[in-house]
Design a protein with these regions (language model features):
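Single conserved hydrophobic/aromatic residue that forms the stacking wall/gate
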Residues: 1-11, 189-197
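Conserved N-proximal alpha/beta basic substrate-recognition cap immediately N-terminal to
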Residues: 5-59, 70-71
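Structural detector of well-ordered beta-strand residues that form the stable sheet scaffold
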Residues: 15-16, 43, 64, 98-100, ...
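Acidic/polar active-site rim loop that often engages polyanionic ligands
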Residues: 35-40, 66-74, 131-141
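Aromatic/hydrophobic pocket-lining residues that form π-stacking "cages" and hydrophobic walls in ligand
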Residues: 54, 157, 188
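Internal nucleotide-binding/catalytic subdomain
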Residues: 80-177
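A short beta-strand motif that forms the metal-chelation/ATP-contact edge
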Residues: 180-187
């Protein structure tokens, strides 16, 4: 993924989405900090630099410890229910990590938004995702969600795209908890292999 780092310098023509945006969305801690500044709810999270940090963070458990960069489809992710779980996990703390507190999850959805031209948008119907062992198993559209969640997820996706000044197609992932609260999880591209016709 680090190919994006030098694109702005290599090409004289403008590269879209901007390489700076790609760098932001490759860093889990940075992307959550960005969304929080927009008053968009995320799950509780905290930066972790060493094992002893987690030993003082019982309030964030049960949670998932994730590398701040790289890792996808369950890679670089460690579910932790209690402090003692750390003893059985082989974690390389020379890397940066983020600890995210688990929510009582009802379902996960994604909103696809395309921003183009003079601040024009196309926002598509939310997609409902099903995971197994932290890996996406299948997706369906439209998602079975309330009108409140439908409107809020589309609004938040548009806000994120606007504030990023994003040009292109963006996928914003959300959690819905059992009390119908919405949480922004991450934002990334949507790849063709996920779509079946």
């Amino acid at each position: 993924r680090q190919w994006s780092r030098g694109l702005g310098d290599v090409y004289k023509r403008q590269v879209l989405p901007k390489p700076s945006v790609n760098r932001l969305i490759q860093h889990r801690l940075a992307e959550k900090d960005f969304v929080n500044k927009l008053n968009i709810r995320t799950t509780r999270y905290v930066s972790v630099e060493k094992k002893s940090d987690i030993e003082t963070l019982e309030d964030f458990l049960p949670g998932i410890l994730k590398t701040t960069t790289m890792g996808y489809d369950g890679k670089g992710q460690y579910p932790i229910k209690k402090i003692e779980d750390l003893d059985s996990l082989n974690i390389d703390f020379s890397k940066g990590y983020i600890l995210e507190k688990l929510v009582k999850l009802k379902k996960e959805i994604s909103v696809i938004i395309t921003r183009y031209g003079n601040n024009n948008f196309e926002i598509y119907e939310p997609i409902e995702n099903t995971h197994q062992d932290q890996i996406l198993k299948h997706s369906k559209i439209p998602a079975e969600i309330s009108k409140k969640i439908l409107d809020q997820s589309k609004n938040w996706a548009q806000t994120i795209a606007e504030e990023l000044k994003y040009i292109g197609t963006l996928c914003v992932e959300f959690f819905i908890d059992r009390n119908e609260n919405l949480y922004a999880v991450s934002y990334t591209h949507l790849t063709l292999p996920t779509i079946s016709c």
